[in-house]
């Protein structure tokens, strides 16, 4: 079960309970800041991360708007900072062409292509969260926690009753596509080089990202 208790500033994931660093009001206040202040605070966080890891960092670069803004802000401070792009084979040609316009970009490739991933693990459907819960119910049946997302027990964004028919889908479903094709190459690169990634995400993109930000803020050391 995932919930937040604003008064006590607690956040719970399953049986694990951690104190949150911020409240939803903190987030709303920061989101209302003028652009200049947001840029200043963001670059301060980049400097903190860079210094904490003694410069052994890189920008995780997908060619999308969020990581492009991040790379621009980072290179205003550290012009030679490396960017790392994972070429999954699923990117639009325009994205690949756009990434090639930047210098000092390391291109990585996953060891498995998309066809191999869906054959071994299953299709990603709806979202990673939905795919994960469907996979767990398919594998473990009604005795697992995920079943509560489909029988009405869980509420809010955890209620997935409308996707319940997918449990009976005649094909495998999994959330492993992103892990295998994007996260794993990045982790292997980090292990090989000793570098830590700078990742640009927006809290307003999902409830999960809001929860992550409430718990740890912008940087997670």
Where are these regions (language model features)?
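ATP-dependent adenylation/nucleotidyltransferase module used to activate substrates
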Residues: 11-221
């Amino acid at each position: 079960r995932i919930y937040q208790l604003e008064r006590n500033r607690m956040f719970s994931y399953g049986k694990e309970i951690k104190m949150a660093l911020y409240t939803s009001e903190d987030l709303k206040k920061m989101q209302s800041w003028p652009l200049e202040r947001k840029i200043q605070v963001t670059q301060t966080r980049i400097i903190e991360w860079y210094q904490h890891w003694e410069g052994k960092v890189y920008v995780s670069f997908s060619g999308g708007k969020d990581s492009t803004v991040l790379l621009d802000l980072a290179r205003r401070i550290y012009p030679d900072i490396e960017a790392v792009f994972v070429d999954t084979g699923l990117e639009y040609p325009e994205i690949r062409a756009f990434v090639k316009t930047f210098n000092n970009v390391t291109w990585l490739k996953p060891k498995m292509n998309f066809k191999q991933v869906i054959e071994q693990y299953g299709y990603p459907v709806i979202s990673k969260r939905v795919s994960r819960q469907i996979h767990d119910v398919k594998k473990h049946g009604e005795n697992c926690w995920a079943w509560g997302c489909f029988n009405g027990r869980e509420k809010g964004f955890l209620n997935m009753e409308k996707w319940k028919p997918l449990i009976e889908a005649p094909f495998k479903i999994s959330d492993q596509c992103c892990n295998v094709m994007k996260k794993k190459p990045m982790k292997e690169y980090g292990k090989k080089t000793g570098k830590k990634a700078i990742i640009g995400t927006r809290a307003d993109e999902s409830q999960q990202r809001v929860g992550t930000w409430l718990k740890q803020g912008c940087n997670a050391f």
